Each structure stands twice: as structure tokens, then as C-alpha cells.
Amino acid sequence: GMSEEKRSPGLGVGLMLVCAVLWSTAGLFIKSVPWNSMVLAGWRGLAATLTLWLFMRKMHYRVRIDMRTVLIGLCVSGTSILFLIANRLTTAANAIVLQYTSPVFLVVLSMLIFRRRYRAADYVTVIITVCGIALFFFDQLTPGGMLGNILALIDGVTMGGVYLFTGESDEERRLSGIFLGLAVTTAVGIPFTVAYPPEVTVTSVLAVIAMGVLQL
């Protein structure tokens, strides 16, 4: 209804700030675990999937599968995997900053898909962010850094998609979508363990579990 429309921008910004803090700690965690990106995505996904599953059981939510939850799921798994790969290729700071382009893509996608109208302030934010991204790109002209930047930008798009599709859904569908995304990430990532056996140390295992639980 109207009240939800009114309330969402402020709430969204708050959520993004919380996310910002979590993702920055993620950047540090990722650097501390010397595993292959896909292996890391898979095991972290497993920890997150189990945490969310326990939470959904407690709340008596079912995992619903429909067009919207699948879209959320694809965006969630895209975001997790791209963030990890980008983090390896570019500096953690770059990957995180570029991932914060997601509000820009959120505004653009929702204008295209939901024909949303925005306030002037939102457009200003978009323009400033775009200028910031341009600076980042010209700063990192090394091929690896560049590829990492591009992946981190696509990551911004998928993250914008997560906010876009979850923003329009009720709690059960929102969590179902996130659950599907984490499950996909787990299924895609864990098989890489065979090709790239990780160094299993207490530190790395704890870091992966912490990442899985916190990243929710």
C-alpha cells in the first residue's frame, strides 16, 4: 500500500548501510581465507543456507518457489559469487565500493521495470555515484584489476536486483528467494572443492562460518 511505498526509501538506505558494514568485514574475511573463490562461495553458502533454514523453521515459513523467488535467488547467488571473485582480482576496497553502485542500479532498474518516480535527491545520488565509479575505473587500469572492477560492477547490478525484487515481496517470499540463492551458491561452489582442495585450518573454517552467518 501507500504507507509501504513511503517507508521504503529510508529503510532501504538504512539496510544498505548495515550491508555496507557487513560487506566490508566480508572483504577482510575473504582476504584471510586463502581458498579458491568458488570453494569459498560454496562453503560460506552452506553455512548461510543452514542458518537461514533454521530461522525459517523457527518462523514457520515455507520455502516458496515462483518467478519472483527464483529471480531473487539468481540475484543473490550472482552477488555472492561475483563479490568473491571480484575481491580476488581487485582490491577489497574496490570490490566493495563498486558493489555500492547497487543503489544506482536499483533506481534505474525500478524505473525501467516498475515505472517508479524518484525525487531529485535520488537522481543526484545516482550522478555522484556514477562519477565515483568512473574515477575508480581510471585508477585501476591493470588487466586483472579491470576485470575485477567489471565483475564488481555486474555484482552491483545483481545486488540492485536483490533489493528491487525483495522490496516488492512479503517476508516469506523474500526469505525463500534468499534461501534459493544461497542453496544455488552452495551447489555451484562446493564441487570446486575437488579441483581446488582448501587448506583446512581452524582460522579458515571459523572465518567461513562467521562469513556465512553474518552475511545474512
Task: Annotate each language-model stretch with its function.
Residues 40, 174-178:
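Juxtamembrane helix-start motifs in multi-pass secondary transporters
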Residues 39-42, 46-47, 84-116, 155:
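Specific alpha-helical transmembrane segments that line the substrate/conduction pathway
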Residues 63-69, 96-99, 115-135, 139-149, ...:
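Loop-to-transmembrane alpha-helix entry segments
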Residues 24-25, 42, 46-50, 104, ...:
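Small-residue-rich packing faces within the transmembrane alpha-helices of Major Facilitator Superfamily
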Residues 85-90, 138-146, 168, 195-202:
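Membrane-interface helix caps and helix-loop-helix hairpins in membrane proteins
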Residues 52, 74-76, 108-111, 118-138, ...:
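Hydrophobic transmembrane alpha-helices of multi-pass small-molecule transport proteins
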Residues 22, 57-94, 98-99, 131-135, ...:
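Specific transmembrane alpha-helical segments of multi-pass solute transporters/efflux pumps
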Residues 1-39, 71-74, 82, 131, ...:
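Glycine-/small-residue-enriched transmembrane alpha-helix faces in small-molecule transporters
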